[in-house]
Structure formats: C-alpha cells, structure tokens
Amino acid sequence: MGDIHRGNVQTPYLVSKAAVIQYTHLLAIELGRYNINVNAVCPGVIWTPIWRQIAENHIDQNPNLKSMTPKEVFDELAVKARTPLGRGQTPEDIGKTVAFFASEDSSEITGQALNVNGGATLD
C-alpha cells in the first residue's frame, strides 16, 4: 500500500488503502483462533514508472525544474519534502519487512499495518 499522508486529495486511492488496513484488522481477529497472523505493510514513496510520469509532468509544467532529471524532481518533491529521513524506500526495504512478518520473530504481531515510509506519517 502506498504511504499514508495527510493532505492528499486522491480520495479513491486513500479509501482503498484504508479498506485494506481495516480488512487486515478484521482478518487478524477472525484468523487468530487458527494461529494465523495477518499484517499489512504500508510503503512510502518508491521510484516507479508512475512517479517518473508525475515528475515529468511537474517538469513540463514548471520552468524552474527544467534543469532537473525526473529522479531529481522525485527526490525533492516526493521524498525530501515528505519524509523526515529524506530518502525514498526501495523494494528491498519492503521485502525485508515482509520477510520479518513471515518469520518467527513476528509471531506475536498480528492485525498491524506497519508504515515503512521514512517517517512520512509522523504527526
């Protein structure tokens, strides 16, 4: 799931993420009696083709960005502006989190939605 970020106006996207988190909670309750853990991972911003297109659109619409590459625009506008750690997440970051949830080390964790987003959701 994408990162949970206040101020975003993409209602269908955010509602679907909220539904998955609620579904995670409900499944954890229902499946716990069978010793099944259910958790969700909420990734932050990961450089993808969609982000490339968004960055390219920003460059096209803003002359001040013409000297920047799409990745540089992404890093400035999507990563540094939104995350206290100032770095985007990688597929490996998400994979490590999923591997943790699949391991015995997380045997007492269920019904959680873990944000792996560089602190983007801190209040």
Task: List the predicted regions and their residue ranges.
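Short, flexible catalytic-loop segment of classical short-chain dehydrogenase/reductase
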Residues: 42-53, 57, 61-62
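C-terminal beta-strand-loop-alpha-helix "lid" module of Rossmann-like NAD(P)-dependent dehydrogenases
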Residues: 57-58, 63-76
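Conserved SDR Rossmann-fold cofactor-binding beta-strand/turn motif
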Residues: 37-43, 47, 102, 115-117
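Catalytic loop of short-chain dehydrogenase/reductase
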Residues: 1-19, 24-25, 29-33, 45-46
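A conserved structural motif in NAD(P)-dependent oxidoreductases
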Residues: 70-71, 83-94, 105
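Short C-terminal tail/terminal secondary-structure segment
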Residues: 5, 98-99, 110-123
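Short-chain dehydrogenase/reductase
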Residues: 24-25, 95-98, 102
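Short, small/polar-rich loop/turn modules that mediate ligand/substrate recognition or access, typified
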Residues: 32, 37, 109-111
